[in-house]
Amino acid sequence: MSLIQKSEHIEPASSAALSAAKTEMLTLICHISHTQLLQLCRTNKLDAKQLQLCQQLARQLSSCPVHVYYRPLCSTQMLTAMTLGTQTDTWLSETGKKDLLTAYLADQLCWQLLENGYQRWSEALKQLTGQVMTGMQFIGNDDPAELASYLKQLTQSEIRILPGGCMQPLKTVLFLADLAPDNAANKKSAPAGVCADCPHPCAYRKDSL
């Protein structure tokens, strides 16, 4: 069974085509493994009964899809927003009413699910672009203006910025996915012809300034 829903191949495009690129959306199906649950329990020194609680929470969370909104900024960077959606916010609110341990574990499992989503997104990017993801540059809420500027470039209605500068749904991340040709070293620079007229200040252009 595919772990990716609605994936469309993106053909290599010119700088002009990239600047006019539209926001696309796909859904990733992610799961938290038993090994990851054991690691969470070891890290937090939990006992067997608390491991059962982790397993129960993970099963509840398994029905949560990971939504990804993406748009190429240039041939070497993909602007990406990844979210667990408002249904997860509701679930966290309900589990948070039980006790502090349950609330903490539920929160940790959500971040683990997002982390698993990064790997699935890396696999999806290779299918979509023929390139590999070599790095992720997270855009944090420490700079609300920058956060708003990047999020505005994604045409979508699910994610918004709250007055305090945080994104909603709460389990949402925004980042730039660095792309490189799929070769052994993954260090090949972008062709000069592709980047010559590109206005996006990615690492390739910064190195030449």
Question: Where do the PLM segments sit?
Answer:
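General structural feature for long, well-ordered alpha-helical segments within catalytic domains
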Residues: 50-57, 117, 121, 125, ...
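Conserved mixed alpha/beta catalytic, RNA-binding, or beta-rich assembly cores of soluble enzyme
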Residues: 76-139
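Cysteine-cluster motifs in flexible loop/terminal segments that predominantly coordinate metals
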Residues: 170-209
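Catalytic cores of large soluble enzymes that bind and process phosphate-bearing ligands
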Residues: 46-49, 106-109, 113, 190
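Active-site helix-to-loop segments that bind/position phosphate- or nucleotide-bearing substrates
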Residues: 1-98, 102
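Short, structured protein-protein interaction patches enriched in aromatics and acidic/basic residues
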Residues: 132-153
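Composition-driven recognition of glycine/serine/threonine/acidic- and proline-rich low-complexity segments
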Residues: 65, 71-98, 147-181
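Generic secondary-structure signature for well-ordered alpha-helical cores
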Residues: 63, 126, 130, 200-203, ...
